[in-house]
């Protein structure tokens, strides 16, 4: 049995109602898991780009891409081999935590403090998914109150 590999697939679609539903139905109907899904319109066009992170054997990934190609609003499917991939995380900390230490840690992970109020500090980091994992592990000592993480975005090199 082949090992499941993490894969990033971009799908260019016509930006119309129910496209996202059809794509997620394709995955769920066949028992494939979507680890991360990000969708945004492509500027100055009537298209959107979906970035899907999934996992599966080579055969499963081939099946997914073939099925995606068959969907009517799909214009292009890109299975990334050599890519730049980023994720973002917003983290809320109590104001009682050390601002300088949090700022230094954020800087090490392509991030910064984006908001400070009387009660909380909000930070943002944007980096490779593994580095976002490391950041989220490293910040535990600052007692984060809330963490929100985006899905992946990717471009072929």
What residue spans do the PLM features occupy?
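Long, contiguous binding/interaction regions
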Residues: 1-48, 53-157
